[in-house]
């Protein structure tokens, strides 16, 4: 891991911490301590001077005014503004006294350079397109181009995979590798991700940083899976683990055309990974997202109910909303639909029957027993219409009409809390004016 922190304004401690935190969250580990580019300026400068000694780079003493004049002349001729190499073959002894030079590389003047890119295929540029770029500024600080190449070499980097907006840089970096006689890494320039409208991904498309996806309730393994599928595939496999990905992935299979970020598809992949995820882990992620302290009883309830909860949710945010079924205690408020269901004479009648039947279940408080008790009431009093019993039961237990399978939820809540919720519903109905005949 290398932190390219030479831009002091952007590389605040907070920004660097965010990178380390996001990588850790995504499960992307690294060997050795991170290398900080800014701490290696002396090493970078040493290589720039070595290139001068090898005759592959030179001191340039041009003043800012001279460079400005060159730009204007080139523009007047309708050419690209670039340095005219006036110091390339000049004797540094003729330099103005006290002038501080920059070091520039000697780019080849003719011929062409080809890079065998792992994603783009062979890419060739005319060397006349390459300029004698600056390697070391007059204050002895290295440019990004030099720093990157020296660091790649010293770290033993074998593959450089990055956005295709860096393709031009690869040719300039290859100049430095070649001039030092170093191995050039394999380059793979991957297309940039576009938004759903086909434009380059930007803030207006929504989430971009790992933290934003995390806040949306996306699991890291789902984000990894989804991002890997953007522009790369393995047959018809949509959902896979990191272990499978590591076995299957080949950089040469990446599409050279841009992919579109599809948030619906991401949620679909996330829903799958939630079903695969460990229930205890999901419960703890959910609790962390909700904040606040939760005691062991409520946590145990949430873990017990997680299998059914996660089957319905697409994100942790949705899961956190549904989790209140297990995290609250009676009495609690009923939403509009639940209140309408309970505020009914038949429902009041059913609720008493449910209460009496479940109170008799004793120790064997299981979903199958609960369901058969409710079915008996429906058969005896409502001509087998199960909804007449299940709907008020769901309203009383969940406080809302959408919930996981409710008999199983009752088993997870346990007899004591289930009875408390039924009692609270009966009190609420009584206050609405439904007396029991």
Give the location of each predicted region:
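Residue-level signal for inorganic ion chemistry
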Residues: 19, 51, 55, 105, ...
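Short, conserved secondary-structure transition motifs
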Residues: 39-43, 192-197
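Core structural elements
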Residues: 246-274, 311-315, 384, 394-400
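Charged substrate- and nucleic-acid-binding regions of tRNA-handling and nucleotidyl-transfer enzymes
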Residues: 365-429, 433
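Conserved phosphate-binding loops in nucleotide/dinucleotide-binding enzymes
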Residues: 136-137, 155-166, 194-226, 230-238, ...
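N-terminal Rossmann-like or analogous alpha/beta NTP/dinucleotide-binding catalytic cores
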Residues: 1-79, 168-182, 222
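Active-site cores that bind ATP or allylic diphosphates and position pyrophosphate for catalysis
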Residues: 58-189, 195-201, 209, 234
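Small-residue-rich helix-loop
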Residues: 279-382
């Amino acid at each position: 891991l290398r932190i390219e922190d030479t831009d002091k304004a952007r590389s605040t401690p907070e920004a660097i911490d965010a990178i380390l935190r996001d990588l850790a969250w995504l499960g992307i580990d690294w060997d050795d301590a991170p290398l900080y580019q800014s701490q290696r300026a002396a090493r970078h400068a040493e290589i720039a001077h070595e290139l001068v000694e090898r005759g592959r780079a030179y001191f340039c003493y041009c003043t800012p005014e001279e460079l400005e004049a060159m730009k204007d002349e080139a523009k007047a001729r309708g050419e690209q503004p670039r340095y005219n190499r006036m110091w390339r073959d000049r004797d540094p002894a003729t330099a103005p006294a006290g002038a501080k030079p920059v070091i520039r590389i000697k780019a080849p003047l003719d011929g062409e350079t080809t890079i065998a890119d792992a994603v783009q295929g062979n890419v060739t540029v005319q060397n006349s397109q390459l300029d004698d770029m600056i390697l070391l500024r007059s204050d002895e600080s290295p440019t990004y181009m030099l720093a990157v190449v020296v660091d790649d070499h010293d770290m033993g980097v074998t593959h450089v995979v990055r956005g295709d907006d860096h393709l031009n840089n690869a040719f300039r970096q290859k100049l430095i590798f070649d001039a030092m006689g170093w191995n050039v890494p394999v380059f793979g320039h991957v297309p940039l991700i576009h938004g759903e409208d086909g434009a380059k991904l930007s803030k207006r498309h929504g989430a971009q940083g790992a933290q934003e996806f995390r806040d949306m309730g996306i699991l890291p393994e789902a984000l990894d899976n989804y991002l890997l599928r953007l522009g790369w595939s393995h047959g018809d496999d949509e959902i896979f683990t990191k272990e499978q990905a590591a076995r299957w992935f080949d950089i040469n299979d990446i599409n050279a055309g841009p992919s579109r970020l599809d948030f619906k598809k991401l949620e679909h992949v996330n829903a799958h990974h939630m079903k695969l995820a460990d229930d205890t882990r999901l419960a703890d992620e959910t609790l962390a997202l909700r904040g606040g302290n939760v005691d062991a009883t409520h946590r145990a309830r949430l873990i017990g109910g997680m299998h059914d909860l996660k089957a319905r949710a697409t994100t942790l945010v949705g899961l956190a909303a549904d989790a209140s079924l297990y995290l609250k205690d009676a009495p609690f408020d009923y939403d509009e639909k639940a209140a309408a269901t309970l505020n009914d004479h038949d429902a009041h009648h059913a609720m008493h029957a449910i209460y009496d039947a479940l109170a008799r279940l004793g120790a064997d408080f299981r979903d199958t027993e609960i369901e058969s008790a409710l079915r008996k009431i429906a058969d005896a009093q409502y001509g087998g219409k199960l909804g007449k019993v299940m709907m008020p039961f769901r309203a009383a237990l969940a406080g809302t009409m959408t919930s996981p399978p409710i008999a199983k939820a009752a088993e997870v809540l346990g007899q004591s809390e289930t009875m408390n919720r039924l009692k609270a519903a009966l009190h609420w109905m009584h206050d609405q004016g439904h007396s029991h005949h």
